[in-house]
Amino acid sequence: PLGALPVDQLINYNSTTWFFRLKGTDLYYFPGVYPKVASEIPFIYQGRKAYMQDAEAPFEIPVSKASDNRSVVSVKASLDGTKMNISRRVVYSGEQKMFGQSVCSPEVSLYGPDHLEAYWRYLKYDDSDPYCVFPKKDASNIKAAFAEYKQKEQADQFKEEVTGYHESDPVKVSGYGVDCVGIRKDSADLVYHVDYEMEGLVKRAGSSMMLAVGKLIGEQMKLEGNDRIRKDRIWRKMAFADEWNIEVALPKGYQASAESLKKLNTTVSNDCGEFAVKASAGAGKIIVHVSKSFLHREEPVANWDKVLKLVDACSAFNEKQVVITKK
């Protein structure tokens, strides 16, 4: 497990984790930590030293790349006075799928109704009811519990997801759903959507409006004071790449200030990753594409200033606004 001694320094087999490798391939199968494609390696095992029973020499378990662990967020928004109606679709791949589990299953369970139905389809059982694999009484109880979860707890989970994304409660959540749980190779991404209304992202300034477009990528890490000083190597769960595709429909008779749009455009790139923003307007819409990547799971402390530049660029964009004026 994460934080344990290297396997060649252990004195107790209870501290080991057993896994399988499909012979002649680079496919590894570890104990599951949440529902996923079976051959996806949990981050807690990546990069660790391991032994196979048919070999004497140890080897290093493969480490995923940033391109393996992606999130793609599509935001479509419209303005209603100072309120904003938002439809957000989230696609997670690789180990980033762990971040979507909070809206997929009850708090007391590793899997939810969407997982059960997806596994049922994957295993191609003939019977159409996925609950028939359980004893009749258990099936009835599980079915009732999952129905209650979808009606009550999942609604709260999606509301909490919105609150976590914006660090502010939504006015209301009008729709949500899990579109794909990501358990099979031909549909490996975890996908969900949520529709809601927010206040505080649009403010009036006379006849104009100020749109907090930077907040549409969710709250970003900001490092201040002593947090900007580091003496140890940098370690994160995984290398990753995030992407946001934002589209904001403007009210009739309004346009985005070309100058404020231009100020959104930025690119910060170095050996550790990249943060880039490209903004434009047309056909009554503001279109913003944002990308962020951290390319390595570990960085030497010598690269801390480079990492800081990326973190600062992300947090600076969080504060960006677009001026919307009457035509």
For each predicted feature, which ranges?
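A sensor for short, sequence-defined functional sites
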Residues: P1-K327
